[in-house]
A protein has these predicted regions:
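Conserved ABC ATPase "signature" region
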Residues: 26-44
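A short, proline-enriched helix->beta-strand linker immediately N-terminal to the Walker B motif
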Residues: 68-72
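Catalytic Walker B motif of ABC-type/P-loop ATPase nucleotide-binding domains
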Residues: 74-77
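Helical segment within the ABC ATPase nucleotide-binding domain
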Residues: 89-102
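A short, surface-exposed alpha-helical micro-motif characterized by mixed small hydrophobic
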Residues: 116-118
């Protein structure tokens, strides 16, 4: 995973702080706890090691570390991969909440149609070493590009009722 297994969650969140900031330990502890709570983890999660966390908690801890330096841009690579549908939906909601409240730009690489529909306001579909289509979910639904059409209007999309939007 994205976390260092030999470090607690709090220590993981502090890694970028130690690397790029010169702050007293007490302040780093406070900032790390703030980020841990910001992503919806309980305060005691800071004392746990990654192996003691559920999949959803691990994803949240990694997100807390990504937010440690208050970035303007966050990159997420398959953030809901390996999560059950309920945890994935909760993570998508968290991403949207953080994006909106912190005015973040979020670049998300995902194959999860639910995540695309819930958390993304613009999408770029990559194929054949280029961007096939770029735009809103509505643009994807109207696209006549064969791969995009199959992906957004195929069987899985119909199960999500995305195809009804076309």
């Amino acid at each position: 995973g994205a976390l260092f297994s030999a470090l607690t969650v709090m220590e993981n969140v502090q890694v970028p702080m130690r690397e790029y900031l010169d702050l007293p330990k007490k302040l780093m502890d406070e900032l790390a706890m703030l980020k841990i709570e910001l992503v919806g983890l309980p305060p005691d999660a800071g004392r746990k090691f990654p192996s003691e966390l559920s999949g959803g908690m691990t994803k949240r801890a990694a997100l807390a570390r990504a937010l440690a330096l208050d970035p303007d841009i966050v990159f997420l690579d398959e953030p809901t991969s390996g999560l059950d549908p309920i945890s994935a939906a909760e993570f998508d909601e968290l991403v949207v909440k953080l994006r909106d409240t912190m005015d973040l730009t979020v670049y998300m690489v995902t194959h999860d149609l639910d995540s695309l529909f819930t958390a993304c306001d613009r999408i770029a579909v990559l194929g054949n070493k280029k961007i096939l289509v770029e735009g809103t979910i509505d643009d994807m639904m109207k696209s006549e590009e064969p791969w995009v059409k199959s992906y957004f209007r195929g069987k899985r999309a119909r199960q999500l009722d995305l195809a009804a939007r076309a």
